[in-house]
């Protein structure tokens, strides 16, 4: 795959065109996750990943965000890893600006409503319990702790 890295407004941007595709994916990855968290901050990056989808200045509720994405046929989600958190939207090329604008609104102008903060705490706790019930996830955590116990990757 051919790709190109450009610096735009001080931000490293990776462009990987795939001519055969009928959609684009805009992925914004942020250097935020467990290896950067202090013990008293454990889990904050994961929690914020959930909260950023709750609304911004232009779309103030999760429903408004979902409706706006649906109007352009976009799929949006986020994922967290040891080194980064990624927020992404996949849509038709003609809606690229719309998708980027929506991600920017959620990430740069996020609004954290108190009722959403409380509700999302429960969602994140349930997600963590789900991982605890997964033998594969449990094995992965035990393996990381065993082999990487003395550094941030062992968290």
For each of these PLM feature ranges, what is it?
Residues 80-89, 114-126, 130, 141, ...:
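Short, glycine/charge-rich beta-strand/loop segments that flank catalytic centers
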């Amino acid at each position: 795959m051919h790709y190109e890295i450009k610096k735009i407004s001080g931000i490293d941007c990776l462009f990987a065109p795939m001519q055969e595709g009928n959609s684009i994916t805009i992925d914004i990855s942020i250097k935020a996750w467990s290896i950067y968290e202090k013990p008293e901050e454990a889990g904050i990056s994961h929690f914020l990943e959930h909260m950023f989808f709750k609304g911004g200045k232009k779309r103030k509720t999760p429903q408004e965000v979902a409706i706006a994405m649906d109007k352009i046929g976009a799929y949006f989600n986020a994922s967290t890893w040891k080194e980064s958190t990624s927020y992404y939207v996949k849509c038709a090329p003609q809606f690229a600006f719309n998708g980027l604008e929506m991600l920017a609104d959620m990430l740069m102008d996020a609004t954290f409503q108190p009722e959403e903060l409380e509700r999302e705490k429960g969602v994140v706790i349930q997600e963590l319990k789900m991982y605890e019930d997964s033998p594969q996830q449990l094995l992965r955590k035990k393996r990381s702790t065993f082999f990487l116990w003395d550094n941030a990757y062992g968290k």
